[in-house]
Design a protein with these regions (language model features):
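Short, flexible loop segments at the rims of nucleotide/cofactor-binding pockets, characterized by
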Residues: 1, 46, 142
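Glycine/small-residue-rich loop that forms an oxyanion/phosphate-binding "nest" at active or ligand-binding sites
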Residues: 1-7
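Catalytic cores of large soluble enzymes that bind and process phosphate-bearing ligands
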Residues: 3, 71, 166
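Conserved acidic, metal-coordinating active-site core of Asp-based
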Residues: 8-10, 14-131, 138
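Mg2+-dependent phosphoryl-transfer enzymes with acidic/Ser/Thr/Gly-rich catalytic loops
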Residues: 102-186
C-alpha cells in the first residue's frame, strides 16, 4: 500500500496550514517539498538522496511510500494537536522520534509488516517478540506475543508492553531481552 499523488496533496495542504514542512519518499528518494519551514529530515538521514522540489513539480504518476515532517519538537508537538481529526481515520500518523512525524497509508505499520513476515515463515504470532521505544513501535508491541519496551520508551509504549527492560536501547536492552526471553532455558 502506497500514497497516491492525491494523498500527498492532502497532507501537503494540511502541513502548509500548520506551518510544517513535508517530505515525500518514493523508492529511496526523498522529495523535499519547498515551504516556508525548513525540513530537518536530511539531518536524521544524511545517506538518503534528497531532491528539493516545488509541490507543483511532484509527479502525479508516482507513488510514495510515506511522508515525513521533521521539525523542532515544541512547535511540532503543538501542531500535532491541531491536525484535522479525519486525517487520523485516513492515515497512520505517529511520531518516531522527538522531531519526526511520519505519515503512512492506513494499516501500514510495523505490526502489519511482522504479520506478513511470520505468515511467510510459518511462525505463530505467540512466538514473536518485538522490542521498541517510540510511538511508531506501538502497533508491533501490542501485536507481538511478547511486547518489550525499552526503559527509555515513550509512556504509550510502556503502557502496552508485557515487559519493560531495566536499561535503555543505548545500553543493549534488546540484547538483554533476547538473552532473557529467547536464549534462556526455562
Amino acid at each position: 500500500t502506497v500514497f497516491s499523488y492525491d494523498d500527498v496533496a492532502r497532507l501537503y495542504e494540511e502541513t502548509e496550514k500548520l506551518s510544517l514542512p513535508l517530505d515525500a519518499i518514493s523508492e529511496g528518494t526523498v522529495y523535499q517539498i519547498q515551504s516556508d519551514q525548513e525540513s530537518l529530515y536530511a539531518k536524521f538521514n544524511p545517506a538518503l538522496t534528497f531532491v528539493p522540489v516545488d509541490f507543483e513539480d511532484l509527479s502525479s504518476q508516482m507513488t510514495y511510500n510515506k511522508c515525513v515532517t521533521a521539525f523542532a519538537q515544541e512547535p511540532l508537538d503543538a501542531a500535532i494537536q491541531k491536525i484535522s481529526p479525519e486525517l487520523f481515520d485516513q492515515y497512520e500518523i505517529f511520531k518516531s522520534r522527538e522531531m519526526l512525524l511520519e505519515w503512512s497509508p492506513k494499516n501500514v505499520h510495523k505490526a502489519t509488516g511482522l504479520a506478513k513476515l511470520i505468515s511467510h515463515l510459518g511462525i505463530d504470532q505467540s512466538q514473536v517478540m518485538a522490542c521498541g521505544d517510540e510511538a511508531n513501535d506501538l502497533s508491533m508491541i501490542e501485536w507481538a506475543g511478547l511486547g518489550v519496551a525499552m526503559q527509555n520508551a515513550v509512556p504509550e509504549v510502556k503502557a502496552v508492553a508485557n515487559v519493560v527492560t531495566p536499561m535503555t536501547n543505548d545500553e543493549e536492552a534488546v540484547a538483554w531481552a533476547i538473552e532473557e526471553y529467547v536464549l534462556k532455558e526455562n
